[in-house]
Amino acid sequence: MPNDASSIAQLLQEMVEHQQSKVLKVARELVPDATPEDIRNPQDFPELFTDTLFNYEDGILTGYLTLQTALRNQVNNESNGIE
């Protein structure tokens, strides 16, 4: 399982990084000087907060990050003998 988990974790990290770039690109179409930090706080920018495409892409990123956290937790539990 560690090799499988490692491969999955690597793939998921690549997906997260790609989606972060995509979210930032969409954000910069609305707010040209948006930073990676800004996209973590879209409520500070009405243009981002109300844009459906931004929210869609941000939701996908949130899902990937949630899955990444769950996978890490599962791997940690398995390595500590917790089921």
Regions found by a protein language model. Name each.
Residues 37-76:
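Short, charge-rich amphipathic interface segments used for partner binding and complex assembly
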Residues 1-28:
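Short, charge/polar-rich alpha-helical segments
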Residues 2, 77-83:
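Short acidic DE-rich linear segments
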Residues 26-27, 75, 79:
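Enrichment for repetitive, rod-forming helical segments
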Residues 25-43:
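Short recognition patches in nucleic-acid-associated and regulatory proteins
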